[in-house]
Amino acid sequence: MYGSFDQDAAPGRRRRRARAAALTAAVALSVLPGGPAVAGPRPAGPAPVVTRAGLDPSLVAGRGAAVDFVEQEAEHARTNGTVIGPDRSAYTLPSEASGRRAVRLTPGQYVEFTLPAAANAITVRYSIPDSPDGGGSTAPLDVTVGPGRGRTMTLTSQYAWLYNQYPFSNDPDAGLLHPDWWITECSCVPAATTPAPTINKPFRPHHFYDEQRLLLGGTHRAGEVVRLTSPPGSAAAWTVIDLLDSELVSPPHVAPHAVNAVALGADPSGRRDSADALDRAVSLARRTHRTVYLPPGTYQVNRHVIVDDVTIEGAGSWYTTLRGREVTLDTPAPDGSVHTGVGLYGRDPAVGGSSDVHLSGFAIEGDVRERIDTDQVNAIGGALNHSTIDGLYLHHTKVGMWFDGPMTDLRVTDTVIADQIADGLNFHTGVTESSISNSFIRNTGDDGLAMWSERTGNAHNTFDHNTVQSPVLANGIALYGGTDNTVSHNLVADPVREGSAIQVGSRFGAEAFTGHLWITDNTTVRAGTYELNWNIGLGAIWFYALDRSIDADIQVVGDAFLDNTYNAIMLVSDWPVKDQVAITGVAFRDIRVDGTGTSVVSARTAGSASFANIDARNVGAVGVNNCGSFHFTPAGSEFSLTDLGGNDGGWLAPWLLPNTITCNDRPAVVPPPAPAPW
């Protein structure tokens, strides 16, 4: 979603951050109900309510990505539709909405947003019904801005609406994919139960939302009204609008001295396949030590383009798009893929990977509608050493970026990843000295950002100043083993199920955590989800010992856990291994907890942790739920807490220390009030 790109990425990033800072200043006077009016002409519509992750931006200042767009939640806008939610229960439309609320329109109804700053582009996050066969439906959405001529967006559900058990199905009428798995709906294993339980269909509908971008054809001033209308006669019985992002996109970037891909046969109309032309452009650019330039347009690419020792620039992610179909292979590939599709890939790590690849200023639009884990249908993949990725928009692929090591020194910046079937980004197996920063990830079908040390450890990697919103499965940020990694200044909001905001897990065959792990100055919002399989609440941050113990130097410092559905912090081991593993030596310091449905800390494992300067308020149940390893001996819990002082709010009372058993996994949940300034 970024529009200005130079040969030197650093000046481009500086300009984007300057624009973001100016945008923040421009809207700061009008972001909250009751706030002072913006200077200038009187707005044509009601005062805009600008949010970040559905909150007053002041509550998350300094956390997350500094983006060029401004977020407005539909539930704060003017509408003659119906506000739905709040609801944090899985498999509901409100639970997957940003802020857990949205607006439902029937044909003829509208929702209006007042622009808080000048804009020439919008992004609409929406949901419409699926078709009866699960193949997807389309519906119009009329868009008008001020008195100008209206436009119509064609919404689709083709990339939304999954059903059933992992890895899910597009068929709403399908029977259980795994009848031999235990399910919470009947608290049974259906295949082993007599009489067989009744399974309602569609079973477990989820992944309801999609987003669509629109250039408005001109710049509209602050105060003009954007009206989104489900037109009379729409085939969609309802249209749910979650939010609108508005943005002032810079003019297209031009690179007159680069290798122009169009001159080598790439088709910006999208009618002809441009993959071979891109190969020619990459080859020429490497021979002549020049950059490949993709002018404005949509380029059809239906396979991977291999990149190595090359720079590829687009005109900006709003102007240059690589778009492809998912293509069924005649025979499975050696890696198990049965499909291919649009993607830029480094060489396989087995042959050393690629190096010195620099990608910036374009979008990749895939066509992935189902999850097949063996398929390599990701937007960016392979191994990229000493490389950079900046200012991309990645949409409708399986994973935005999946990197297989060994590889080192990759920098991902200022990138948007949205509407993925699985992860947003995964550093997998031996990725070192790499980072993603100032990037925005929304509506992933698995972990938003992950470091997975499967077989070979990751080391010295950083996730910094990213925003992860509404992962519909798993976690916002997940860390599976590794050495000396850092997660800092991120904003994670609205995880839904089978995960939470931040996970530290010894699972999935990951190598051990060694050295240090720093989790510092992050904010989570509306996390601490309900774990359906365990029938308990998780923590906004949760530590999970399954494959092995967790005993590295782990420092959780300066974080804020806001509006937690259940717990703020959880340390847990799985029941079958509870007497073989432990979580020890985790240090929590300088943390604020504003609202828990249940506890500040829930310990369901052997081990220990220390706490210093943890301020907590609006705690729904006992401050510490300490079950340990569930042996309940007179010596107390197998988990010990150390009070290092400065813990305010009464949550860590002396009688709880060091290991008093207070085990109640399912206390009454007290919904906390909305977060407020401390």
Where are each of the predicted segments found?
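Secretory targeting and sorting signals
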Residues: 1-44
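Extracytoplasmic
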Residues: 45-256
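Acidic Gly/Asp/Thr-rich repetitive segments characteristic of extracellular carbohydrate-active
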Residues: 261-293
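Extracellular beta-strand-rich solenoid/capping regions of secreted or surface-exposed proteins
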Residues: 279, 283-284, 299-313, 321-360, ...
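Extracellular beta-strand solenoid repeats
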Residues: 283, 293, 300, 306, ...
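Short glycine/acidic-rich loop motifs that flank beta-strands on beta-rich extracellular proteins
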Residues: 290, 301-304, 317, 321-327, ...
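Right-handed parallel beta-helix
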Residues: 318, 355-366, 385-398, 407-422, ...
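Leucine-rich solenoid repeat scaffolds
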Residues: 603-666
